Amino acid sequence: MTKTVWITGASSGIGREFARRYAAMGCRLILTARRADRLTALAEELNDAHGTVCRILPADLADRADCDRLCAELAGERIDIFINNAGFGVCGSLLETDPAKEEEMVQVNVAAMRRLFQFMLRRMQAQGGGTILNVASSAGLLP
């Protein structure tokens, strides 16, 4: 049976590499990130290289409505592996960083990650199993 893998933060860095690895393994992919153009380019790359079937679901995970929309769209879908990878960091002195950008970071790195984790945990319990990997790393941003 072909496994379905949902990857958030799939358009770059660690998420893109997860997509490439799972595509090489013959998995069906659901790719989520903010930039639809990058997701489309990645889906084309993976289809050309491996014949991978990719579903593209662009979303801004800082927006609760986008998180809710993703959950609604995927409610009936069997997802075997969930890579909860979306995230970013704001660097600099607390006195100098933009408070709105920091709030956006908390929404993506904490609130959305928790919301999607809970959604997938319930889905996987209902379907009889699955795998969730929560990724929290700044390694993809460092030289």
What are these regions (language model features)?
Residues 11-12:
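Conserved glycine-rich cofactor-binding loop
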Residues 25-41:
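Conserved glycine-rich Rossmann-like NAD(P)H-binding loop of the short-chain dehydrogenase/reductase
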Residues 137:
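Residue(s) in the substrate-gating loop at a strand-loop-helix junction
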Residues 36-37, 58-69, 99:
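The beta1-alpha1 cofactor-binding region of Rossmann-like NAD(H)/NADP(H)-dependent oxidoreductases
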Residues 117-118:
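A short, exposed helix-loop element centered on a Lys and neighboring polar residues
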Residues 93-95, 101-106:
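Substrate-binding pocket helix/loop in short-chain dehydrogenase/reductase
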Residues 85-90:
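Conserved NAD(P)H cofactor-binding loop of Rossmann-fold oxidoreductase domains
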